[in-house]
Amino acid sequence: MQQEALGMVETKGLTAAIEAADAMVKSANVMLVGYEKIGSGLVTVIVRGDVGAVKAATDAGAAAARNVGEVKAVHVIPRPHTDVEKILPKGISQ
């Protein structure tokens, strides 16, 4: 995980998730690493980058998603432990 922050925005519905992803990558220097469909219409979008950029990106993503849908959760892990990669969806851990 290279000590990069991990940011997540969880939405109800794919449209809000796509809107969040678009806003996140446009608003800050972050890398969109994927998404996970949780079930019951919940979709989590995940980004990586330095802490400040990830915080700015998740704030922008959540605001954009609220314009078209519902935001369930927003969270930033500043320096996730390397073992956290074990629970990330396939294709997201690097």
From Swiss-Prot:
It is found in: Bacterial microcompartment. Disruption phenotype: Cells do not make BMCs, diol dehydratase is found in diffuse aggregates near the cell pole; it was later found this a double pduA-pduBB' deletion. A single deletion forms larger than normal BMCs; it is not fully complemented by protein produced from a plasmid. Grows in an interrupted manner on 1,2-PD and vitamin B12; grows for a while then stops, then restarts as toxic propionaldehyde accumulates and then decreases. Increased DNA mutagenesis, showing propionaldehyde is a mutagen. Keywords: Bacterial microcompartment, Transport. Changing S40M: No change in shell permeability, wild-type growth on 1,2-PD. Changing K37Q: Improved growth on 1,2-PD, makes slightly larger BMCs, alters accumulation of PD metabolites. The keyword Chloroplast does not apply. It comes from the Bacteria. The C-terminal 14 residues mediate binding to the N-terminus of PduP, which encapsulates PduP into BMCs. One of the major shell proteins of the bacterial microcompartment (BMC) dedicated to 1,2-propanediol (1,2-PD) degradation. At least one of PduA or PduJ is required for BMC assembly; it must be encoded as the first gene in the pdu operon. Not required for structural integrity of BMCs, it is required to mitigate propionaldehyde toxicity. Controls diffusion of 1,2-PD into and propionaldehyde out of the BMC shell; residue 40 is particularly important for pore permeability. This is Bacterial microcompartment shell protein PduA. It comes from Salmonella typhimurium (strain LT2 / SGSC1412 / ATCC 700720).
